[in-house]
Amino acid sequence: MITATLKGIELRLETAPGLFSPRAVDAGTLAMLSRVEFGQEDKVLDLGCGYGVVGLVAARLGRAERVWLLDQDPAAVELARANLAANGAGASTVVLSDGFRSFFETGFDKILCNPPYQADFAVPKHFIEKGFNRLAVGGTLTMVTKRELWYRNKITSVFGGVKVSEVDGYFVFEATRKTTQYAAKRLKPRSRVGS
C-alpha cells in the first residue's frame, strides 16, 4: 500500500511487485500530471494504466463514469479496479486489452500515457497512431518519456505538431487532434521534375 497526494487529492493505492513503480508513484507520471488539467466533462483514457494512478486522478477531478483505464496485464487491471473503488471512483471503466486491439471506445478528450521503454518503439507507435483515431477532434494525447527525438518526430508525423515540455528530466508531449487524417497523409506528394 502506498499513499500519494496528487492535484490536492489524497490517494491510497494497492500495488504489486510485478507492476511498474510499485513503491511510489513514478516521477514520469508526476511530470505528466503536472501538465494536465481535467475538466468535469472530459472523456479520459488512461492508456497502460498500471494500478490506476492517472485514471484515478482524472476520475476524482472529473466524472468517474467518463474515465476509462486500459492495460494488458490482468494484475494491473484488477488492482486498478480495486484502487478506483477504494478511492471513490468505482464508476470508471477498466478494460483488459493489448493496446487498442480489444478496445473500441472513441471520442476521447484526453488520452494519457507513460509508455514502456523498449528498443523497437512498437508499443508507443501503436499508442500514438491508434490513439489519434480514438481522440475526438480537439482532443489531446499526452505522453511522458525519457527520450525526446523519436517521440517528437512520430507524434508530429501523426498529429502535425507537438508541444514538448521538459519536467524533472522527463519529456512531456502534448498533441491535439485537429483533423480526421494523420498529418503525413495530408501532405501532398511532391512532383518530381525530369522523371
Tell where the protein language model's regions lie, with residue ranges.
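Conserved SAM/SAH cofactor-binding pocket of Class I
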Residues: 27-113
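Conserved beta-strand signature within the Rossmann-like core of class I S-adenosyl-L-methionine
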Residues: 138-145
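Short beta->alpha hinge that forms the Motif I/post-I loop of the SAM-binding pocket
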Residues: 71-74, 123, 146-147
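Class I SAM-dependent transferase core
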Residues: 1-39
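Core SAM-dependent methyltransferase catalytic element
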Residues: 168-195
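Class I S-adenosylmethionine-dependent transferase superfamily signal
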Residues: 58, 131, 155
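Conserved helix-to-beta-strand junction in the class I
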Residues: 87, 133-135, 158
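A short glycine-rich, Lys/Arg-flanked "PGG" loop and its adjoining helix->strand segment in the class I
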Residues: 125-137
